[in-house]
Design a protein with these regions (language model features):
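C-terminal catalytic histidine-bearing segment of alpha/beta-hydrolase fold enzymes
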Residues: 266, 347-354, 379, 383-425
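N-terminal cap/lid segment of alpha/beta-hydrolase-fold proteins
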Residues: 90-133, 138
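Short substrate-entry loop that stabilizes the transition state in hydrolases
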Residues: 134-137, 145-172, 177-183
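Alpha/beta-hydrolase active-site loop
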Residues: 189-211
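N-terminal targeting or regulatory segments adjacent to alpha/beta-hydrolase or S9 domains
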Residues: 5-6, 14, 20-105
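Accessory cap/linker subdomain of secreted extracellular hydrolases
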Residues: 255-362
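Short beta-strand/loop motif that positions the catalytic acidic residue
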Residues: 370-377
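Primarily recognizes the serine-hydrolase "nucleophile elbow" in alpha/beta-hydrolase
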Residues: 204-275
Length: 425
């Protein structure tokens, strides 16, 4: 295959810009939150708060052509690996992307009401990213991966998934409960029903916004998610196909997800290891919040995590990488109590029973579906995707399983995003 020299040059310039931003990152301050009034209310739509949009055109072609080729992805993949997928480098990529899209798109942090699985009505937040051209190809519902700090929430940064706007789609992303405007709440981690409701409720609030600006669009949805976002993307697809006849789900892309949460917990306990050190603690307290179990940290955590959980995790000040650096251990036996790792204990049994309600095995999508997982994943056990495949194996030719040794969880994420971007028309 011929490599376009211009793509290599542009890719090198892009990475140089990222390097400069990464070097300067320690001198910049991330936005941890917005005031409630900074979010544009979508339900009901606050038209007075909406910015005036005069532009009707934006030249996305250079960036689209760059991302449609392989050179920039190869450069980014190698450079990310060299920087050990550091928070600073990832944020510098987001800052570079934001600069490239700033004058070509309308990015709106927004608030809306969502009805959660337990019936609670919450004020949540997310982001809607629009190209200036008023003719959309559809809407990409992008479900974000595991985050720890509030400044990583989609409404407070420029998420990687915003690149789909260069293909002519609106990109819609929910922050999930516990981030953005609801950062004071505990995030119900890996409770896909909560995140799927948050995402679909945001989708339902978008048509009035698009009508206000005069956008035309088919009622077609692409559901996308990686890592924590993968089971959410499947859940979103299920909700749309089963309960929203006015919307058509055209494609589903899910990568490296913890589809069977109870099994994932068992796997981590059995191996006394977890790829993201704070993941199981977040899962315990998130499940407690989502299912109103009122679990006590003393039954599950050892010091120093027990003493500092509120500061390190619940404050949403630190990324998962920063929390990992604080904990200095990937062994569950060093952060959790014996009781918390024993399903025969009453409180752990209550937690585990709730986990068994949080898997999404068995749902068979009816749209074009691409399921991806690296067999070498170091964060989300590959057995999750094996179980998902076994649970939905049919003669349905619309489902593609792409399971191969694509490297670590983070390395495979770049490959997945590239594959999806280059596949979407």
């Amino acid at each position: 295959m011929m490599i376009n020299p211009k793509s290599i040059i542009l890719g090198c310039l892009l990475c140089l810009c990222i390097e400069v931003l990464a070097a300067a990152h320690s001198c910049t301050t991330a936005t941890d939150t917005l005031a409630t009034t900074d979010y544009i209310c979508l339900s009901p739509l606050d038209t007075a708060a909406l910015p005036t949009l005069h532009k009707t055109k934006s030249n996305m072609r250079p960036l689209r052509n760059l991302l449609q080729g392989n050179a920039v992805w190869d450069i980014l993949g190698r450079t990310l690996k060299r920087h050990h997928y550091s928070d600073e480098y990832i944020q510098s990529i987001q800052q570079t992307l934001e600069k490239m899209l700033r004058k070509k798109t309308l990015c709106l942090p927004c608030s809306y009401t969502s009805i959660q699985p337990n019936g609670d009505t919450l004020l949540l937040s997310g982001t809607v990213i629009l190209p200036y051209t008023r003719e959309l190809k559809g809407i990409v519902l992008a479900c974000h991966y595991t985050i720890g700090s509030n400044h990583e929430a989609p409404s407070l940064c420029c998420p990687f998934e915003s690149i789909f706007v260069t293909k002519g789609y609106a990109v819609v992303m929910a922050d999930y409960v516990g981030f953005g405007i609801s950062a004071n709440l505990t995030h119900p981690y890996l409770y896909w029903q909560s995140a799927a409701n948050a995402t679909v409720d945001l989708l339902q609030a978008v048509p009035n916004l698009l009508a206000h600006y005069g956008y035309t669009y088919p009622n077609q949805i692409i559901s996308y998610g990686y890592s924590e976002g993968a089971p959410v993307a499947l859940g979103v697809a299920q909700v749309i196909e089963q309960t929203l006849p006015d919307w058509t789900l055209t494609a589903l892309y899910a990568g490296a997800g913890p589809y069977n949460v109870a099994m994932t917990y068992d796997y981590c306990v059995q191996h006394d290891s977890v790829g993201i050190p704070c993941a199981i603690p977040m899962l315990i307290m998130g499940t407690s919040a989502g299912y109103h179990l009122n679990l006590q940290k003393e039954d599950f955590f050892q010091d120093p995590l027990l003493t500092h959980y509120e500061e390190w995790v619940e404050s949403k000040r630190y990324t998962v990488n920063e929390i990992a650096n604080i904990l200095q251990s990937h062994r569950l036996s060093e952060v959790m109590t014996d009781t918390g790792r024993d399903k025969t204990q009453s409180e752990t049994a209550r937690f585990y029973n709730a986990l068994q309600q949080s898997d999404i095995l068995g749902y068979v999508p009816h749209c074009q579906t691409y399921l991806f997982h690296s067999t070498e994943d170091d964060m989300v056990p590959f057995v999750n995707s094996e179980q998902l495949q076994n649970s939905i194996t049919t003669n349905n030719s619309t489902i593609t399983f792409d399971f191969a040794p694509y490297g670590t969880h983070m390395a495979a994420c770049i490959r997945f995003l590239k594959q999806v971007y280059q596949t979407i028309d």
